Amino acid sequence: MENILDLWNQALAQIEKKLSKPSFETWMKSTKAHSLQGDTLTITAPNEFARDWLESRYLHLIADTIYELTGEELSIKFVIPQNQDVEDFMPKPQVKKAVKEDTSDFPQNMLNPKYTFDTFVIGSGNRFAHAASLAVAEAPAKAYNPLFIYGGVGLGKTHLMHAIGHYVIDHNPSAKVVYLSSEKFTNEFINSIRDNKAVDFRNRYRNVDVLLIDDIQFLAGKEQTQEEFFHTFNTLHEESKQIVISSDRPPKEIPTLEDRLRSRFEWGLITDITPPDLETRIAILRKKAKAEGLDIPNEVMLYIANQIDSNIRELEGALIRVVAYSSLINKDINADLAAEALKDIIPSSKPKVITIKEIQRVVGQQFNIKLEDFKAKKRTKSVAFPRQIAMYLSREMTDSSLPKIGEEFGGRDHTTVIHAHEKISKLLADDEQLQQHVKEIKEQLK
């Protein structure tokens, strides 16, 4: 069969004729041919959402198109690239190789062209890690060696490591830069023993200028691999070569990691990355939208940033999902559409933040009184009773202190709040009508 890349490009050209432009641009354009093994053609999708959609909607179309081109019935399989942050639906630019082509005995690792210092969004949670990474890139083995970056999944550790690699190569094209995961290091080490090529393996990783090794926690419990990496580390460090390491936790918390490795990781600088704050999340979304030429309303970016606060990967994935959903149903992007698109991925356990003002608003609607009446000095039953219910609910449904609640009700004393809470609690024990009123108010608030 012809070259797999050529085949897939031909298939895409045919599929483009069969789909609407929005559907093709959204779902097909970002796919890549991965491999052909036996009668199974494997295609990469940018993320889980795209993979699931392709499998459910376009599997037969793709298989039929391949058959038309080759006369062969192939099974189609979709995968997501491993160790890669959320990608978008746009075609990827040519990747930059981390080493020059003429070094044939050197590992041909690739750096993600999107992971540069220019595309990294700086916030309070990553500012120090970014500064340290830039310092290392500007002066390899002279600033911090090793540089150890740790933090949760999808927070930008890999981005910074690739950015260091790009910067070094851009300023010194002859530099030998290698990026790999510790899992790949382990697998290659095992294969070198099996194939009796241990010397080749050592030469490959001990003759570099910059070694960027991701997810070092994977070495935990692997004694022989730790032994090999220990000597690799020593060789590079003694020859003033830069080492950058990432992990999901600090060295002292990696289980079954040899003390001698742990101590060496602590020779240089250890810095963490924490989840981005709201302002940083919004900035990340804006930069992503601008890079892809997307016009996303501010209210939508604020909504996504408020809902997704765990990591950058999920944040960008949510934006992709909203854009894709908008394209599919052919509607403009707004906050309501974003809520609909993300309803399946926003944690249902995430509690809504209920405020005293919101309680006053809902109680006011139930009893037909104005918001200002809650703070007024009126003592008529038509106002005082709803006010007491609102105080009761403020005590039950918010974390506000008694003085704070009193302040929100016209500067009343905290003893007034206590009295209101006790009174409504007693009435609720016997008054079914009041029970129903309070139940309805709580349901509206939730």
UniProtKB/Swiss-Prot annotation:
**UniProt keyword annotation of Phosphoprotein present:** no
The entry lists its GO molecular-function terms as: ATP binding; ATP hydrolysis activity; DNA replication origin binding; identical protein binding; lipid binding
Which residues bind ATP per the record?
A: 154-158
Q: Which GO terms describe its biological process?
A: DNA replication; DNA replication initiation; regulation of DNA replication
Q: Where is this region: Domain II?
A: 83-103
Q: What is this protein called?
A: Chromosomal replication initiator protein DnaA
Domain of life according to the entry: Bacteria
User: What is the documented function of this protein?
Assistant: Plays an essential role in the initiation and regulation of chromosomal replication. ATP-DnaA binds to the origin of replication (oriC) to initiate formation of the DNA replication initiation complex once per cell cycle. Binds directly to oriC at a 9 bp consensus (DnaA box): 5'-TTATCCACA-3' and separates the double-stranded (ds)DNA. Forms a right-handed helical filament on oriC DNA; dsDNA binds to the exterior of the filament while single-stranded (ss)DNA is stabilized in the filament's interior. The half-life of ADP-DnaA is 1.5 minutes, of ATP-DnaA is 5 minutes at 37 degrees Celsius; in E.coli the half-life of ADP-DnaA is about 45 minutes.
Q: Which CDD domains match?
A: AAA (cd00009), Bac_DnaA_C (cd06571)
Q: What is the effect of changing residue 271 to A?
A: No longer interacts with DnaD or YabA, still self associates
Report the EC number(s), separated by commas if there are several: 3.6.4.-
Effect the entry attributes to changing residue 50 to T: No longer sensitive to SirA overexpression, no longer interacts with SirA, DnaA interacts normally with replication origin
Protein activity control: Oligomerization of DnaA can be controlled by Soj; monomeric ADP-Soj inhibits formation of the DnaA helix. YabA prevents the cooperative binding of DnaA-ATP to oriC-containing sequences; increased levels of DnaN (beta sliding clamp subunit of DNA polymerase) removes YabA from association with DnaA on the chromosome, enabling increased association of DnaA with its chromosomal binding sites. Both Soj and YabA chase DnaA from oriC site, YabA tethers DnaA to the DNA replication fork via the beta sliding clamp subunit DnaN.
Query: What is the originating organism of this protein?
Result: Bacillus subtilis (strain 168)
Could you list this entry's UniProt keywords, alphabetically sorted: ATP-binding, Cytoplasm, DNA replication, DNA-binding, Hydrolase, Lipid-binding, Nucleotide-binding, Repressor, Transcription, Transcription regulation
What does the annotation give as the result of altering residue 26 to A? Lethal in vivo, loss of interaction with DnaD, protein enriched at oriC, does not recruit DnaD to oriC
